[in-house]
Design a protein with these regions (language model features):
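Generic N-terminal targeting/processing segments that precede catalytic cores or assembly contacts
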Residues: 1-369
């Protein structure tokens, strides 16, 4: 099992959903950065379960930084975060141990770990571990923000309902990002918020679940981040986004829409306006895998939560018998509104790692004449 990622900055994720605690270690952070614990708490609150549209498993999610920080500043050594699991109900899972939940990692975990995996609450595969990602991602976002780089996401669509997309106008986009970052249910159009909540509540009442698409925007990035081919900006960010449970699709800019465009429509013409920029942004601020200074726009597809309360056909892995399965326990009818801060967090980590690569090279290069 590979639980770590990163080049200049690495993070290692550990723990299980129903274990005593979950945690994450960030290694390679610069020394001397003042960490805003209140901002970490605010970001954690965006991920918390709320009302009828989320799981009834409510955790305190108190973030304990046990190394790598002293007197509120990063020390430059490995920073480890621990979050205790205080509200587990493992008996909800013992009743159907071995019965494979459709859409979950139960079968694949059995095949990979030969039954030694902690299956309770999904174990290490659980979305519970994203709490650690949000805590660590908050620190990464704070460092990026100190450099003028800001990230924000909103629910672009949920089931058949759609929000207003992020604006192509930079000033309005900046305003939209700051506004959605203050919201628990992140939509630009507050009117559609209530319609979306009603759809989630309806699906929950039917014992079903919903998915949708998140739109993420990053502004303030300098040109020149990323590497050709294997460490392109798209490669790094999509790798990290796909590590978020329930993500099934990632696209940048026009994405699959390019298939219906001509080159004359898809190309972003350059012009000079105090700096070189593009007149349009179909390519989402990335050319050749490297940032061009325009906003990065990402679309992430989140599948409907696989834990539904309808009876489903399955197999008992232990007895090798066909069975009917009805899942018990506490589950989300939709995770879009909670996943948005998780996507922001993994994107922040990837960008900070790329940013540190650029800083390592830039001072060694003279100006081209």
């Amino acid at each position: 099992m590979k639980n770590n990622f990163g080049t200049n900055i690495s993070w290692t994720l550990f723990g299980e959903s129903h274990g005593p605690a979950i945690g994450i270690t960030l290694d390679g952070l610069p020394a001397g950065f003042q960490v805003d614990m209140e901002q970490i708490k605010a970001d954690m609150d965006k991920r918390k379960a709320t009302g009828k549209i989320s799981t009834q498993r409510h955790e305190a999610d108190e973030v304990h930084i046990i190394s790598g920080m002293y007197n509120g500043y990063t020390t430059g050594t490995a920073l480890t975060i621990i979050i205790e699991n205080q509200n587990t109900k493992s008996k909800d899972y013992s009743a159907f141990h071995g019965r494979l939940r459709p859409g979950h990692a139960d079968f694949t975990a059995f095949e990979k770990y030969n039954g030694y995996q902690d299956y309770r609450g999904g174990g290490h595969f659980s979305g519970r571990l994203t709490a650690c990602i949000v805590a660590a991602g908050s620190i990464c976002r704070q460092i990026l923000k100190s450099q003028g780089i800001v990230i924000g996401s909103h629910i672009e669509s949920l089931y058949t309902l759609s929000d207003i997309p992020f604006s192509q106008d930079y000033d309005l986009l900046e305003k939209q990002i700051f506004e959605v970052n203050e919201k628990t249910f992140a939509v630009i159009d507050d009117q559609v918020k209530y319609q979306m909540i009603q759809e989630i509540e309806k699906a929950a009442a039917e014992g079903d679940s919903l998915g949708g698409i998140l739109e993420t925007a990053i502004i303030g990035l300098p040109a020149g981040l990323g590497e050709p081919f294997f460490d392109s900006v798209e490669s790094i960010l999509s790798h990290l986004i796909f590590s978020v449970p329930a993500v099934k699709g990632v696209s940048f800019g026009e994405g699959f829409g390019f298939a219906k465009m001509k080159g004359s429509q898809a190309n972003d013409a350059f012009h000079f306006n105090n700096k070189i920029e593009t007149q349009t942004n179909h390519n989402a601020g990335i050319n050749g895998g490297i940032t061009n200074g325009m906003p990065i726009i990402i679309h992430t597809c989140i599948k409907p939560t696989p834990s539904i309360f309808k009876t489903q056909e399955s197999v008992d892995y232990l007895s090798k018998e066909n069975v009917n399965l009805q899942i018990q326990g506490r589950h989300d009818p939709c995770i879009l509104h909670r996943a948005r801060i998780v996507v922001d967090s993994v994107v922040a980590f990837g960008l900070l790692d790329l940013y540190m690569s650029r800083l390592a090279v830039k001072p060694l290069q003279g100006d081209f004449e």
